[in-house]
């Protein structure tokens, strides 16, 4: 089993996800969104499963800095913004084959491990 974790090194939940998989000896490939933004196609997988609103971190500093509190964008515009501004993403985004999660989801990850 191998997972891919999208997040930033500064994000506490991303570090918890890395530790969760490390403690269970699951190989995890980390993608630091601050250095390498996620591709549009990769984000589309998460949008199709959860919707674009689930991916936007309305509590993030970047969200406030950009003044998005009153923003009313289409899903397409939000997706474009998330590609351009990866620090707006709610992290970690975790993918294992076709299984996906947004945010800290340890019980879900545990079920993935149990099923493998």
Where are these predicted regions, by residue range?
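Local sequence-structure signature of Cys/Sec-based thiol-disulfide redox active-site neighborhoods
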Residues: 1-24, 28-36
């Amino acid at each position: 089993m191998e997972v891919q974790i999208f997040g930033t090194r500064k994000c506490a939940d991303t570090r918890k996800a890395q530790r969760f998989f490390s403690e269970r000896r699951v190989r995890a490939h980390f993608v630091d969104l601050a250095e390498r933004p996620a591709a549009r196609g990769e984000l589309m997988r998460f949008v199709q499963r959860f919707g674009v609103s689930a991916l936007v971190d309305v509590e993030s500093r970047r969200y406030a800095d950009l003044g998005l509190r009153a923003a009313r964008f289409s899903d397409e515009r939000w997706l474009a913004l998330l590609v351009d501004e990866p620090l707006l993403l709610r992290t970690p985004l975790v993918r294992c084959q076709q299984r996906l999660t947004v945010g800290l989801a340890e019980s879900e990850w545990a079920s993935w491990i149990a099923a493998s």
